[in-house]
Amino acid sequence: MMVKLRNLVLFFMLLTVVAHILLYTDPAASFKTPFSKRDFLEDVTALTFNSDENRLNLLPRESPAVLRGGLVGAVYSDKNSRRLDQLSARVLSATDDDTHSHTDISIKQVTHDAASDSHINRENMHVQLTQQTSEKVDEQPEPNAFGAKKDTGNVLMPDAQVRHLKDQLIRAKVYLSLPSAKANAHFVRELRLRIKEVQRALADASKDSDLPKTAIEKLKAMEQTLAKGKQIQDDCSTVVKKLRAMLHSADEQLRVHKKQTMFLTQLTAKTIPKGLHCLPLRLTTDYYALNSSEQQFPNQEKLEDTQLYHYALFSDNVLATSVVVNSTITNAKHPLKHVFHIVTDRLNYAAMRMWFLDNPPGKATIQVQNVEEFTWLNSSYSPVLKQLSSRSMIDYYFRAHHTNSDTNLKFRNPKYLSILNHLRFYLPEIFPKLSKVLFLDDDIVVQKDLSGLWSVDLKGNVNGAVETCGESFHRFDRYLNFSNPLISKNFDPRACGWAYGMNVFDLDEWKRQNITEVYHRWQDLNQDRELWKLGTLPPGLITFWRRTYPLDRKWHILGLGYNPSVNQRDIERAAVIHYNGNLKPWLEIGIPRYRGFWSKHVDYEHVYLRECNINP
C-alpha cells in the first residue's frame, strides 16, 4: 500500500515539472517560417511605447522643427512606398507622443549621436516594411498618380502633388545653399537639372489635373536626388537653421503681400473703370439731344398702383442697374405687373434715363428720379446728411494718414459718403402712397420670380430679410461697439445679423412704428462714430431690432463678392445672388467663377458698350 502511495506522489511531482516546462516554453519558437518576422512587424504601429524610448530603435528620432521643415520626405517611387509612408508616419507619430518630454534635447545631439545607427535602422525599416506591404498593396485598387484618394478612408487634396513638387523645390534650393552639397559638383549639376525639370512640370499648375503626365516621373527623380543630398549632408542643424530663416522670410513676405493686396483691392473697388466712366458720358450727351417728349417714360400711371409689384433701387451705376432690372424681368412670370423705382444722383440722372429709354425692360414700368429733387431731404431733417457734410467725416474718409491703419481701411470707403446709401431709411417719404416695397441693391442678380415675396406675412414686422447666423462674424458684436453702454444695454451681442440687398419693407407698419424717427435718434447718438463705423448695415440692425422677419434662405444668397467657395448648389437654388464685397462682377478683380451669372444679362454687342470698350 505504501509503495502505491509513493508511486502516486512521484507521478504527480513529475507531472508538475512537465507542466511547468510546457507552460513556459513557446512551442512555436522552433518553427521558423518566412512570415514570422513579417507578422511581428504588422503590429508595430499598435505597440504602446511605455518603456524606455531607447528600446525602440526602428527610426531615429527627429526634432519637431525638422519634421515641420519637411526634411523627412516621402519617396513616392511606387504604390508600395506610399504604403510605407503611411506606416512610417504612424510610427513617427507614436514615438513623438511618448517622447514629448524630451523635446528640449538639441538637434545637434540627436542628429550626431545617432547618425550611424539612424542610417542603418532607416534602411532596415524600409526593407522590412516594403516586404510587409508588398502583398497587401496588390489587393488595393491602383491609385491615380494625381487622383483624389490614397485609400478608401483618406481623401487627398486636389493639389496634393502640386504642393509636394513645390516642397521638393524648397528642399532642393536648401541643399544647393549648403557647403557640403556645394563641394560635390556632380550632385549640384544633377540637382539643378532636377529643379529645372520640376519647374517646367509645375509651370502655372494650381491643381493636380493641370500637371503633365510626366510630372510623377519628375517627382520620383527629384526624390532620388534629394535622397542623395540627405546622405551628403551630415549636419542637420545647418539645414534646420536654413529652413527657419526661409520660413521667417516667407512669413514676412506674406504679411507684406497681404497688406498690399488689401490696399490695392480697396483702391480698385473705389475706382471707376474707364468703360463705366465713358458709358454715362455718352448716354448723357445723347439724352440732352432728345426733345422733351422723347425723354418721358410710358405707363407712369402705374407708379402708385398698390396692386402691382414695386421695386426700390438706388444706384449711380448704369450698367449694374440694368442687370438688376433685366434679370428681374427675365425671370418674372408677369412682367407687366412689375414697377421699378430707380433713384440716382445728379451726375447720372440723364444717363440712367437715356439707358432705359433706349433699352426698355419689356412690359415693365420704369421710373428714374434725381435724389437732389427730394427737397425734404436736407441736413435739418436728416442727421446723417448733416454728418456726411461735416469736416470731421470728410477727414475720416479722405485724409491720407488714415491709410496706415490696416484694421480701419475698409471703413474708409468714400462710397459711404453718398446719400444714395442711406435712402433705404426714407422709403415711406420717397413712396408715400405705396404699402409694400422690395428693396434691391445694384450688385445683385435675380434668378427666380420674386412676386411671391409680396404675399409673405411679415407678422407685424417692418423688414423681411434673410438672416446670416451661419457665420460667427455675421452677429451683432461684429458690427456694433458693445464696449459702449448704449449698445450693450439695448442689444444682444450674439443676435443674428441679416442681409441688406433684398428686403421686403411693409411701409404701412413702418409709419405705424415711426421707424424713421428711431433711425434719426440713433444717428444723433453716433455723431462721433462711437457706436459703429461701417456703412448702413449697423444702423439697419439697430433700427430694425426686433422688427425683422426672417425669410427663407433660398431667397437670398450672399458672398459672391468676396468668397470664392460659395456652394454651387446654393447659388443655383437662390432667387437672388448677391455680390456683396469688393470683388464686383463688373470689375477686373471680380471672381471669375461667378462672373457668368452677371454677364449673361449684359448685351456686350450694344452700341454704347462697344463704343466704350466694355467687354466680358
From Swiss-Prot:
Cellular location(s): Golgi apparatus membrane
Cytoplasmic side: 1-6
Keyword DNA-binding: no
GO CC annotations, alphabetized: Golgi apparatus; Golgi cis cisterna; Golgi membrane
InterPro entries from the UniProt entry: GAUT, Glyco_trans_8, Nucleotide-diphossugar_trans
Gene Ontology MF annotations: polygalacturonate 4-alpha-galacturonosyltransferase activity
Family as reported in the entry's similarity comment: Belongs to the glycosyltransferase 8 family.
Protein name in UniProt: Probable galacturonosyltransferase 4
Gene source species: Arabidopsis thaliana
Gene name tied to this protein: GAUT4
